[in-house]
């Protein structure tokens, strides 16, 4: 059980929808500090959060997740002056715009990866940090494909791949930073707007989503926090239809586990065994 009490949490997302509801729940967990980095200032939302727990310090910065990593580093140097350290980094910035592939990929995947690469040194135990937890908030269509939102789905598949790769013991045993993901099902806020399919053949289905049964952002936010509290390194959760489900992960490449062992091994005999097994296949 991951105890959020006293933690310093940094949430990179727009303060609305899932992000706002998740932040509301976090404020009930007796966290010490909450940094909100978002593209647009939302003072009413910040005031609403502060009213939940007056003793929790809330900091706000306008933030463009698509900025270059060099600029991001300067940005987080300033953030760390106020935060001192980060226990939990939540990546929740998201965009579904099938007509703007670059923006969708840059927001959902590239920006998230740059954020993680920028923040990790502050958390890394071998670099003076205390370890911690990185939470990537993504989508169920990062687990299963979507014929309607192809670019969005591709970006979310990337989030899952990045999460699983970074959670490998190769990193975790060194830096002490656990990495997990929560795949959210569709919410009312997501479907209640104009949605464009990647190809015109899928537009009818995109339009029908407005009538589809969806979870509320409040329930989804609650389950994101539930997943954080129950988390272990490398876990992927589904938050959908009011419930929370742990994903059973699979290895599809038959040499995956041997390949990882090969990379980590310094024993020549072990390496020869891997190569022999690979060539037999």
Swiss-Prot record:
Substrate binds at residue 139. CDD domains: ADH_SDR_c_like. InterPro entries: ADH-rel, NAD(P)-bd_dom_sf, Sc_DH/Rdtase_CS, SDR_fam. Keywords: Oxidoreductase. Pfam families: adh_short (PF00106). GO terms for molecular function: oxidoreductase activity. NAD(+) binds at residues 11-34. It comes from the Eukaryota. Gene3D superfamilies: NAD(P)-binding Rossmann-like Domain. GO terms for cellular component: cytoplasm. The keyword NADP does not apply. The active site is at 152 (proton acceptor). Belongs to the short-chain dehydrogenases/reductases (SDR) family. This is Alcohol dehydrogenase-related 31 kDa protein. It comes from Drosophila ambigua (Fruit fly). The lineage of its organism: Eukaryota, Metazoa, Ecdysozoa, Arthropoda, Hexapoda.
